[in-house]
Amino acid sequence: MNVFDVIGPVMIGPSSSHTAGAVKLGNVALSILGERCVSADILLSGSFASTYKGHGTDKALLSGIMGLSSDDGRIRTAWDLARERQLDCRFRPGSIPGAHPNTARITLRGETGKTCEVEGASIGGGSIMIHRVDGLAVNFTGQSHTLLIRHQDAPGAIAAVTNLLAENGINIGSFSLTRAKKGGEAVMMMEVDNEPCQELNEKIRLLPGIMELIFIKR
């Protein structure tokens, strides 16, 4: 933990968990969608569900989905901005068994019809943890540049990606792998120390067995 974790982020109030963290959750979901969002369905669990209106969590999540930062004054008028942008957003208080108290399950649809589902929690001080992407278990914070790579589970798939990153001077800080079943769809998650260029990301996308690459800028 560093001093900024204790002090908390620069943000529009009232709470780092309910505002700054919620904005970041929306930002990450938008990055994973990869295009302008036209509709959002958000399931809120725990304290998010019970206090989201009073603490402005709805405005914060909505702002993140629209690409605003946690210190953007427009968070206060997020609903007006969403109407201007013709973004349809629905919040549903509920319960996600076993989830952190400040958890949201965010389902987005983009302008081309692409969809994504992201489940994550605001864990305090403006920090977040993403637990699921489209139903697959992951664990990343968004504090580092992050690569999510969907691929066919096959020998050599991981090595092909990590070798290409190493050849281009990209150091991996953390790595995890989730697969639905042996030989099926899998997801590599890598937090990296420096940002891979677009050309490198395209080279990874062209590797055998790669289905999708999502880059989340810190």
What do the predicted segments below correspond to?
Residues 4, 33-35, 81, 95-100, ...:
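Solvent-exposed alpha-helices and their adjacent loops that cap or buttress functional pockets
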Residues 51-59, 101, 185-191:
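Short glycine/threonine-rich loop-to-helix capping motif typified by GTGT followed
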Residues 89-94, 118-218:
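A conserved regulatory-domain signal marking ACT and ACT-like small-molecule sensing domains
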